[in-house]
Amino acid sequence: MPREKGRKVVASNRKARHDYSILDTYEAGMALTGTEVKSLRAGRASLVDAFAQERNGELYLHGMHIPEYVQGTWTNHEPRRTRKLLLNRTEIDRLIGKTRESGLTLVPLQVYFSDGWAKVEIGVAKGKKAYDKRQDLAKRDAQREMARAAGRRSKGMDD
């Protein structure tokens, strides 16, 4: 069976972009079982409350939920098991160094298939304060209102 080309997004973590300031992003592979891959191909995954953490010089993804494969048998996987992230040693060392800085964490932003391989986009993130979140919401509302007004003006519906 030929490998599909392109990028097919399975799950996005929109809440992470709201709760954190993303400083840098990395693409990592994941060590998965067969039923996990089949469940991901069916578009079933959740990144809510997921995070990456260092253990014994390796990075692991915790809290990602991949539901059991519907047609799976006794070989089905544990939905919230810890999954190893596959990165180059230099990338792992760089990410571990960044997480040891105060206030920085690793959060998954997207899970997708890239040329047939399951990948996760990891973001180096710093937690936002409540007032930062409010500022972002106010800024987004202002931009939306300006776009709406510009659309009305271009259609000749200006009051």
UniProtKB/Swiss-Prot annotation:
What cellular component GO annotations does this protein have? cytosol
Cysteine pairs forming cystine bridges in this chain are: none
Q: Does the keyword DNA damage apply?
A: no
Q: Please state where this protein is localized.
A: Cytoplasm
- Any one Gene Ontology molecular-function term assigned to this protein's record: RNA binding
Q: Where is the composition biased (Basic and acidic residues)?
A: 133-147
* Xref: CDD domains: SmpB (cd09294)
The UniProt entry, under PROSITE patterns, shows: SSRP (PS01317)
Region Disordered: start-end pairs: 133-159
What biological-process terms (Gene Ontology) are attached?
Answer: trans-translation
Name the residue ranges with Basic residues bias.
150-159
**Record function comment:** Required for rescue of stalled ribosomes mediated by trans-translation. Binds to transfer-messenger RNA (tmRNA), required for stable association of tmRNA with ribosomes. tmRNA and SmpB together mimic tRNA shape, replacing the anticodon stem-loop with SmpB. tmRNA is encoded by the ssrA gene; the 2 termini fold to resemble tRNA(Ala) and it encodes a 'tag peptide', a short internal open reading frame. During trans-translation Ala-aminoacylated tmRNA acts like a tRNA, entering the A-site of stalled ribosomes, displacing the stalled mRNA.
User: Which family does this protein fall into?
Assistant: Belongs to the SmpB family.
Q: What is this protein called?
A: SsrA-binding protein
